[in-house]
Amino acid sequence: MTRISSDDVRKVSKLARLEISEEHVETYANQLEEILEYIAQLEKIDTKNIPPTTRAVEVVNVLREDIVDKSNVRDKILDLAPNREGQFYRVPKILAE
């Protein structure tokens, strides 16, 4: 396995625009190396007979019929506003002229 050097960590952190202190560079190098070793183990698994999936549990849309219903709640909701002008809420002006 290729050894992750301190220079590699510095380069990646610079590309990612992350500030890493010198005391943490070696720690991150070791962690990245462990991650790459784990990925190498995963690459050895035979997945030829396993179909590709996007998720572990299949998701199904639950649909219902649309029911047209007369509803006149607009006026009731507008009546709850502290200030109303016709079919609109009236709010204080926030932009200066």
Curated annotation (Swiss-Prot):
Keywords: ATP-binding, Ligase, Nucleotide-binding, Protein biosynthesis. InterPro entries: Asp/Glu-ADT_sf_sub_c, GatC. GO terms for biological process: glutaminyl-tRNAGln biosynthesis via transamidation; regulation of translational fidelity; translation. Transmembrane segments: none annotated. GO terms for molecular function: asparaginyl-tRNA synthase (glutamine-hydrolyzing) activity; ATP binding; glutaminyl-tRNA synthase (glutamine-hydrolyzing) activity. Its EC number is 6.3.5.-. It catalyses: L-glutamyl-tRNA(Gln) + L-glutamine + ATP + H2O = L-glutaminyl-tRNA(Gln) + L-glutamate + ADP + phosphate + H(+); L-aspartyl-tRNA(Asn) + L-glutamine + ATP + H2O = L-asparaginyl-tRNA(Asn) + L-glutamate + ADP + phosphate + 2 H(+). Pfam families: GatC. It comes from the Bacteria. Allows the formation of correctly charged Asn-tRNA(Asn) or Gln-tRNA(Gln) through the transamidation of misacylated Asp-tRNA(Asn) or Glu-tRNA(Gln) in organisms which lack either or both of asparaginyl-tRNA or glutaminyl-tRNA synthetases. The reaction takes place in the presence of glutamine and ATP through an activated phospho-Asp-tRNA(Asn) or phospho-Glu-tRNA(Gln). Belongs to the GatC family. Heterotrimer of A, B and C subunits. This is Aspartyl/glutamyl-tRNA(Asn/Gln) amidotransferase subunit C. It comes from Prochlorococcus marinus (strain SARG / CCMP1375 / SS120).
